[in-house]
């Protein structure tokens, strides 16, 4: 068991996987921004993610895409802060804000965010000072370049895992010097950030080494480029690869998984946990009648055609 402190919350991690559902308040998100263009649509998405099994809602207002211009700060605040207030207030959710900007982080925390997901690798120490002041948890992610810069250099790293460990250990020290409690910190190895697919795969294959840092591990692996490189599929068709990466992360002892497809991830975890043993399901577990593939046809309805054996 490992403790994470996030403002007034004390979270116990380790007994099960935690799911961080993604809500993009940016219309140019690489994955699904254009599908949820209004705050009402984004709030409904958050509601659905929570109902599907999300433990945390991660909200961001600027796409990580490098082919888009930066979003002005006031516009990003306008996108994100009202949504955070409603997801935190109306839905009672644990909210993470995806930002590296201190002014946005401060406004987000005031609106109800409990976690700052900083994808810059703590490039601005003011983020750490803010989290120390407010008690918000802080995600420390590995990246050797500034946000929104793309770097694909197959010769950038020697022992990539050792270099990521050293970088994150130094970032932990910076955060602690700013006044953060050790239990406020989360570690993210930064898949795809300034890494080729091969480098990301090598790093994640050695994920267990990051436990040396003593903090919860966040795996942000949903629909990532390394999955696309392995499967040849575009972002919205990378669910199977995402679940495979999730399974590997579980085996390596990761704690939190940032995913778009929360329902599928929750289903995967339910089946995996049941088959892994432990307490096991109740002896009274039965399939609901409406879920049977051979259920009787309703009056006036033709039986469904069966094109494939299910047994």
Which residues does each PLM region occupy?
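Phosphate/pyrophosphate-binding loops at sites that engage ATP/ADP/AMP, CoA/4′-phosphopantetheine
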Residues: 50-51, 169-184
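Catalytic domains of carbohydrate-active enzymes, especially glycoside hydrolases
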Residues: 44-60, 252-253
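Structural motif
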Residues: 17-20, 138, 184, 216
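Hydrophobic "anchor" residues on beta-strands that sit immediately upstream
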Residues: 20, 54, 94, 114, ...
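Active-site-adjacent loop and "lid" segments of alpha/beta metabolic enzymes
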Residues: 4-7, 31-45, 64-92, 99-103, ...
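N-terminal carbohydrate-binding accessory modules
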Residues: 1-16
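N-terminal binding-site loop/beta-alpha segment at the start of enzyme catalytic domains
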Residues: 12, 17-39
């Amino acid at each position: 068991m490992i403790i994470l402190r996030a403002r007034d919350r004390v979270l116990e991690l380790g007994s099960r996987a935690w799911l961080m559902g993604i809500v993009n308040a940016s219309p140019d998100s690489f994955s699904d921004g254009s599908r949820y263009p209004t705050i009402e649509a984004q709030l409904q998405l958050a509601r659905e993610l929570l109902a599907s099994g999300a433990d945390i809602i991660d909200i961001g207002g600027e796409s990580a895409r490098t082919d888009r211009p930066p979003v002005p700060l006031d516009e990003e605040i306008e996108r994100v802060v009202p949504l955070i207030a409603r997801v935190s207030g109306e839905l009672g959710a644990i909210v993470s804000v995806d930002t590296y900007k201190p002014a946005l982080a401060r406004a987000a925390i005031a609106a109800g965010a409990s976690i700052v997901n900083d994808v810059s690798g703590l490039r601005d120490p003011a983020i750490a000072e803010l989290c120390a002041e407010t008690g918000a948890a802080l995600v420390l992610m590995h990246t050797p370049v500034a946000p929104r810069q793309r770097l694909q250099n197959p010769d950038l790293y020697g022992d990539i895992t050792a270099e990521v460990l050293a970088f994150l250990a130094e970032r932990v020290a910076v955060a602690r010097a700013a006044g953060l409690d050790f239990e406020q910190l989360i570690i993210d190895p930064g898949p795809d950030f300034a890494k080729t697919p091969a480098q990301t795969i090598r790093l994640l294959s050695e994920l267990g080494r990051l436990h040396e840092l003593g903090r919860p591990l966040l795996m942000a692996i949903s629909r990532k480029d390394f999955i696309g490189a392995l499967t040849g599929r575009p972002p919205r068709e990378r669910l199977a690869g995402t679940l495979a990466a999730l399974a590997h992360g579980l085996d390596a002892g990761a704690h939190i998984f940032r995913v778009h497809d929360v329902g599928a991830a929750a289903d995967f975890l339910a089946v995996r946990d049941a088959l892994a043993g432990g307490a096991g399901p109740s002896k009274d577990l039965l399939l609901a009648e409406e879920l049977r593939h051979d259920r009787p046809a309703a009056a006036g309805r033709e039986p469904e055609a069966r094109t494939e054996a299910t047994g």
